């Protein structure tokens, strides 16, 4: 009696149910939705923004540079002041005494 049951009732019922579902209901629904959206709604809007940004970005930098350059001419009064003139002299006199020691200047003297 134990020889006619195990080899007969164990194989057929376990091999039929998992074979008709996974390979049939999975591939079709997963391959359709992603095929009609990405290749259609992505390339279109992504190619337009970079085209409309170029023209407006080239105009603003063209009207400003030529306008902000002339104002720097107002710097003369800054050089006439005594503070900026006195500060430049002491900074330039410090390196002279180090020059005779070496022909390189302040570089080798700083290490000494």
From Swiss-Prot:
GO-annotated biological processes: nodulation
Ranges where the record places region Disordered: 1-112
Alphabetically ordered keywords of this record: Nodulation, Repeat
Basic and acidic residues composition-biased segments: 17-67
Domain of life: Eukaryota
Record's keyword annotation contains Cytoplasm: no
Role, per record: Involved in early stages of root nodule development.
Protein name, UniProt field: Early nodulin-75
């Amino acid at each position: 009696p134990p020889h006619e049951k195990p080899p007969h009732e164990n194989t057929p019922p376990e091999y039929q149910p998992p074979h008709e579902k996974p390979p049939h209901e999975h591939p079709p629904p997963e391959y359709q939705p992603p095929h009609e959206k990405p290749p259609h709604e992505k390339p279109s809007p992504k190619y337009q923004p970079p085209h409309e940004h170029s023209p407006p970005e080239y105009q603003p930098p063209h009207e400003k540079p030529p306008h902000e350059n002339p104002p720097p001419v107002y710097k003369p009064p800054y050089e006439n002041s005594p503070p900026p003139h006195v500060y430049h002299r002491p900074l330039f006199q410090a390196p002279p005494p180090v020059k005779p020691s070496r022909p390189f200047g302040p570089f080798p003297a700083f290490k000494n």
